[in-house]
Structures are given as C-alpha cells and as structure tokens.
Amino acid sequence: MTRDDPFAMSRRAVLQSTLGFGALALNGIMAAETLNRPDGRPHFMPKAKRVIWLFMRGGVSHMESFDPKPALNEFAGKSISETPYKSVLDASKIRKLRVPIKGDANGHTRIKIFPMQTGFKRYGQSGIEISDWFPNIGSCADDIAFIRSMWTSDNNHGAQVQFHSGRHFLDPRVPTIGAWINYGLGSLSENLPQFINIGPRFFDKKDAHYLGPAYDAVNLKIDPKNPLDYAKPSNGMTAAEQRRNLELTNKLNRFAAKQYPLDPVIEARIKSYELAFRMQTAVPDALDFSQESSETQKLYGLDRNETKSFGQQLLAARRLSERGVRFIQIMHGDGAAGAWDNHSGLKNGHSRLSRQVDLPTAGLLKDLKRRGLLEDTIVVFATEFGRTPGSQGADGRDHHSFGFSVWMAGGGIKGGITNGSTDELGYHAVEAPHYVTDVHATINHLMGIDPHKLEVPGHKRLEMDFGHVIEEIVF
C-alpha cells in the first residue's frame, strides 16, 4: 500500500473522529499493525506471565528501608575520615562518575555521618531485617528476595531513565524493559493493551524509542470520579453509532484487502479497530472497584485517605494483570525529581511516603498470593538510587548511586532471602554487586525471553544492556 492510498492516509483521524476512539486506545492498538515484531512466543519455558513494576521516584534511602546499617548510629556526628571505613572514598567508582557527586572526595570526608532515622525488626521465618517504616511489607518478607547490592552510574535523577533502560541519561535513548517485554511477547488479552503505565511518569516520556510508538506504555490515570474519560466515545457518539461506523470502516478495509490481497497490514488494521472498540468496555470494567469486596478494598488501603491513591493504582494493576496485561508500571512520587528526594526532612518525608505505599504494596502481594497469581506474576519494588550515609544539611541525605536496595517477588523468585550487601556504612555495593540491567535480565529469564534474540537491525545493543540473571534469587 502506498502513501497515496486513501485507506492508509488517515488512520488516526478515522479512529478519533469517525470511530470516536480516545487517546488511550490509539497507542495500544497500533502494535497490531507492526510487521517486524517477533512471533510472540517465549524462547524457552517461562516461569512468569506478567510483571507489576513499582518504582519509587526520587531515591529511597536503603539504610531506612531494607538495608540496616548500625554503624551509622555508632559513628553518628563523625566525619567519614574519623571512622574505620574512610577507605570507601578511595573507590575508583567515585573518580569515574560521568556526573560527579556534589563536592569532591575531601568534601565528603568532612560530611557528618547521619544516624538511621528509624529502627529495624526481623520478620517472618527468614528473620530478614526491615525498617519500621515498612511493617506491612515486612509481613511479606518470606515471599520477597531483597537485593541489597544495586549500583548505577548516574548520581542525578536521570538515573530513573537508566534503571528502566540500562543506559545513562546522556546516552541516546533505548527501549525500556517494559517496551522490550511488550515487543517480545504475544498478547494475553484480546481486549487490552499489553503495556500500561499508571500514575506519573519518570523523566522519559517514552518507552519504546527505536521500537516505535506502538510499544510505548499506554498511560492510564485513575480518577475515581471519572476513571476513563479520555477513552470514551467522543463528540457525544453513542456505542451503537460507534459500532455502525466501525462496521462501515471494516467494510472499506475489506474492500481494500481485495485490492491488495498480499498486504498483511489491512487485516491487522481491521483487528486493531475491533480491539479499540472492545477496550472501551474492558478498561472501565477493569477499573470498577465496586466489584471488589470491602475486605479486598481495605487490604489495599482504599478506606484510608493516606493509602487510597496508591491502593487504587495497585488494585487496578491486579485487575488488569489478571485480565491479561503483560507489563504494568506504577510510579510513586510526584514532582520533577520525585517525592522521595529528601535532601532535607528525610524522617518526615520518608515516613510519610512509606505510609502511602507500605500497606497497599503488601496488600497487592497478599491478594496475588491468595488468588494463585503470585506464582506467575513478578512484582518489582525499585528506585533510581539510594541516599548517602552522610547528612545533607541538618536532616537529609544526598543522592547515592554506589549501593542501594530493590526487591523482587513472585513468579520464579525465591522468597525470604537477601542477595548481596553494601559495606558497613552502606556506601558501596561490595558483595555480589548488580548493575540495574541485572534486574532486567532476571525478568527476561523468568518471562522466557532471550534478549539476544530481540536484536533490531541498525540498533546494536551493548553487552551491558543485557545484564546478568541474578541466579541466587531464582528457582
């Protein structure tokens, strides 16, 4: 079909005007028209079918969440150079940062060590220590693998891009892990897109880049008063009128199919229009929380103002995932950098934010488990970097890329374990250090994907892009 073909000229106009499809439908359905995607089958037997990706924007302090450091209390108020651990500042990573830490190494020796701002308790049969700010996640410790040795090379908030894509913010953009999953695997649902973003975005507003916009996440904003306004038929069009227009458009497409019998795009287009129509029923249904019991709603914190917003997002994630959405990413922390970026007021900031996410996150894990979904759903809880062991100002911590924590649970992940460690001050990942793409590699492995087989002509991937499976945490 040529550019002059009238059936190819205005697909978007037809969808939006003639058929009345909103913005939500457009991105998700156009993947059906892409010709060069893989066949959608896993490369080997998968252990998981879907991913729920929870990302805390701004930088969660590892020593106030999942990596206790009692030495911070022991040496509180002293400079790093006054402790037995002053050698942490000699590491080559500090000298090789592309975006340097604020101040030089000598300046950091003068920064006073900031004590932990909360306590830790042991949870579950595993006895893993978890912050008092995350007691509900603590109650799920035996289902979680805590990775305490993550590192990245960006010490600014562009690290949000790096954690999702594996590439530095200053490098040319490449697809994110969600886009690769969307590109590499076939659909589990005839009615929904395969990659959805709920809530605010990270620094990059796109996911797929050279894979094409068909593989970007479909952005979904949950509004209890009007949950899916932009996916309703436009211009006052009724569902019956939209169906008639759809049938007319499909007749035109089938006429074009007779004129161009060897063109596979036309049949894909017919299917994609049908998908967009079905989405207008399927998505609102997935977001209809009235179908859930009051007990389930309380499990996610929908009965509390502090947890309601994040709880709604996670409940939506569960409902979308059980309906076949492959990859759901949820960002927590508004603002340009992300609300977890507590350069000052860390105790007040982190304790408030943790109350927003702790109960709903634990509720998600417990709900997935009791429904039998956790065994084939990967849940990731991540952030772009940690925070410094030293103070910034009187009561905050600065960005820290050399060592921090994330956790994974669910499909194929061992529960009740920790992997890797940082040094006594939480400064460097010293045991089993993992670059951010090791998380990607682990997800790909569990989803049955060999990323080396997803190469796109003209876009050579680096070895660092693939990462290494964190073997110690998978079955």
Locations of regions flagged by a protein language model:
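Ligand-binding pockets and gating/stacking loops
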Residues: 1-475
